[in-house]
A protein has these predicted regions:
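Residues at the C-termini of beta-strands that transition into short coil/loop
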Residues: 44, 78, 118
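A generic structural signal for alpha->beta connector loops
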Residues: 35-37, 70-71, 111
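Hydrophobic/aromatic beta-strand patches that form the interior of the parallel beta-sheet core
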Residues: 39-41, 75, 89, 115
């Protein structure tokens, strides 16, 4: 299965990436390079972590993934990030899943697909 597509392709998805670290930023760049609409979210108290690229919204990855992409939306507004997103990818440490689940409560729909990372029973947290 590939997520790569071109503009106008029905496979083009709106994807919200939640998190401020290297994994969230790399996933955002990779998905954008594959043609998707990408929304990168950080809560208000962490949005400063995006200050290096907040003006241009361009993130550059170096290493195994070499890419430089302009992210569609960088926001601390949860509705702007996840509203009408096809996929929500939560890239936070296990200790933050409860916090993010509370932020997402009431802002998601049954049609959206949520992806989480790590084995801290995150799926049970988001199910509730």
């Amino acid at each position: 299965m590939t997520f790569s597509c071109k503009k106008g392709d029905p496979a083009l998805k709106k994807i919200a990436v939640l998190g401020t670290g290297n994994i969230a930023q790399t996933i955002a760049v990779d998905l954008k390079a594959s043609g998707h609409e990408v929304r990168l979210f950080a809560p208000e108290n962490l949005i400063h972590r995006f200050r290096d690229f907040a003006d241009t919204q361009v993130i550059e990855c170096v290493g195994a993934l070499e890419a430089r992409e302009r992210i569609d939306i960088i926001t601390s507004d949860i509705d702007q990030a996840v509203g009408q997103a096809d996929y929500i990818i939560v890239c936070v440490t296990g200790s933050h899943h409860q916090e993010y689940a509370q932020m997402l409560k009431g802002h998601t729909s049954a049609e959206q697909i949520m992806v989480t990372f790590n084995g801290c029973m995150a799926s049970l947290i988001y199910k509730n």
